[in-house]
Amino acid sequence: MPPKAPCKECIMKKIIIIGASSGLGERIATDFARAGWRVGIAARRMDKLETIRNLYPANIAAAEIDVTAQDAVKKFYDLIELIDGMDILLYAAGIGFYDPDMEDERVTTTLDTNVTGFARITAAAYKYYKSTANRTPGHIAAITSIAGTKGIGVAAAYSASKKFQQTFINALEQLAYQQQVNVRFTDIRPGFIRTPLLDPEKEYPMIMSVDHAAPLIETAILKRKRVAVIDSRWAIVNGLWRLVPQRVWRHISLKW
């Protein structure tokens, strides 16, 4: 069962970040903690989470959560209780591969994290907000990708998984309206960002640093934007390629 809503006297804002052990999740977690938020961080690498927690021990709580495991929801709810509530969930966990050979292990690993794990945690967050809807306005934010707006052959599992995330958010939003659950949604769609997800030896078009992308993502979350493409250059590219019909798109060779 979802945990109870926090007490009315607990005025410190609270955010839980899934996938906070490195990259964007780590940076956003430390930024929110520095700003005075109570931050719950979760990932599989507890040693890395402890290092981050020690930067702001009064503001950060850490939990080892593998989103692909059956106990992920229980541990997620335990983390909500540990920080006494959740104003925002940010799902920043993700994995993907350049995989033109469609290797089975890479495909299944991608789908386990980006589809099953994502649905498991965001659905649990929705249930939490539904159980506390009259007292605690909710916000579910997720870092998806512009890759979710088109099928990308050399990263088929990744792009399809990101499309799933975007559609799942849309479906939850509709459900929230139908059930009158007070929760907002933010779909964050970045282009290439230099994080451990990418091959450090490769060059990528219009690649962004974490220092550049993180503040843009944080602004989108705090302003509760419904969809935010990161950054403006990628917004233009994304707008253009969405206009390309599939009969043309299938002939385009994307390589990186």
Residue ranges and their predicted role:
Residues 21-22:
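Conserved glycine-rich cofactor-binding loop
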Residues 56-71:
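Rossmann-fold cofactor-recognition segment
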Residues 92-98:
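Conserved NAD(P)H cofactor-binding loop of Rossmann-fold oxidoreductase domains
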Residues 99-112:
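Short alpha-helical oligomerization interface
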Residues 122, 161:
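Active-site helix of classical SDR
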Residues 145:
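Residue(s) in the substrate-gating loop at a strand-loop-helix junction
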Residues 187, 202-238:
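C-terminal helical subdomain
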